[in-house]
UniProtKB/Swiss-Prot annotation:
Cellular compartment(s): Cell membrane
Subunit structure: F-type ATPases have 2 components, CF(1) - the catalytic core - and CF(0) - the membrane proton channel. CF(1) has five subunits: alpha(3), beta(3), gamma(1), delta(1), epsilon(1). CF(0) has three main subunits: a, b and c.
Membership in a protein family: Belongs to the ATPase epsilon chain family.
HAMAP family assigned to the protein according to its UniProt record, in alphabetical order: ATP_synth_epsil_bac
Known function: Produces ATP from ADP in the presence of a proton gradient across the membrane.
GO cellular component, one term: plasma membrane
The keyword Ligase is annotated on this UniProt entry: no
Keyword annotations from UniProtKB, A to Z: ATP synthesis, Cell membrane, CF(1), Hydrogen ion transport, Ion transport, Membrane, Transport
InterPro entries recorded: ATP_F1_dsu/esu_C_sf, ATP_synth_F1_dsu/esu, ATP_synth_F1_dsu/esu_N, ATP_synth_F1_esu_C, ATPsynth_dsu/esu_N
PANTHER family: ATP SYNTHASE DELTA/EPSILON CHAIN, ATP SYNTHASE EPSILON CHAIN, CHLOROPLASTIC
Organism: Symbiobacterium thermophilum (strain DSM 24528 / JCM 14929 / IAM 14863 / T)
Topological type in the membrane: Peripheral membrane protein
Annotated GO MF terms: ATP binding; proton-transporting ATP synthase activity, rotational mechanism
Protein name: ATP synthase epsilon chain
C-alpha cells in the first residue's frame, strides 16, 4: 500500500492524478530530491529532468521540463511546464529531435539561437532517458 499520492499537472492536461507512490525523486535546481512518507511541507523549483516514483516496488519515470513541486500531508503535486510518462514517449521522435538539435549546435555558420538549441537538446535527452533509451542515471 502506497503511503503518498502524486499528481502531475501541465498547462495542457493532468498527466497523473493521485497516483499511489511509496517514494518520489524529483529533479530540482540544485540536484535531485527524494520524498518519502511524512516529508516536511515544502515547495521547490523543478529543472528539466526525469522524475521517478516508486509504485508497487517498481520505479516509474516521467520526463519533466521545469515548474514546481509542492509537498504537503503526503501529497506531492507537480506543476510542470511539460511532462510526459515514459510509456507515452515516442522514442524515434525524441531521437530525431536530439539529432536536429545536435546538428544545429554543430553548424558554426548558421545564425541560430544557441540557448534555444541547447534547451531543445536537453529536452530530447531527458525524454530519451525517461523512456529508457539513454542512461537515465545521469540525470
Amino acid at each position: 500500500m502506497a503511503d503518498m499520492s502524486l499528481t502531475i499537472i501541465t498547462p495542457e492536461r493532468t498527466v497523473l492524478r493521485d497516483a499511489p507512490a511509496d517514494a518520489v525523486v524529483v529533479p530540482v535546481v540544485d540536484g535531485s530530491m527524494g520524498i518519502l512518507k511524512n516529508h516536511a511541507p515544502m515547495v521547490a523549483n523543478l529543472r528539466i529532468g526525469v522524475l521517478r516514483y516508486k509504485q508497487d516496488g517498481v520505479y516509474k519515470r516521467v520526463a519533466v521540463t521545469g515548474g514546481f513541486v509542492e509537498v504537503s500531508e503526503n501529497r506531492i503535486t507537480v506543476l510542470a511546464d511539460a511532462a510526459e510518462l515514459a510509456e507515452s514517449i515516442d522514442v524515434m521522435r525524441a531521437m530525431e529531435a536530439k539529432r536536429r538539435a545536435e546538428a544545429r549546435l554543430r553548424d558554426r555558420k548558421a545564425n541560430i539561437d544557441r540557448t534555444r538549441a541547447e534547451a531543445a537538446l536537453r529536452r530530447a535527452m531527458v525524454r530519451l532517458r525517461a523512456a529508457g533509451a539513454l542512461d537515465h542515471d545521469k540525470d
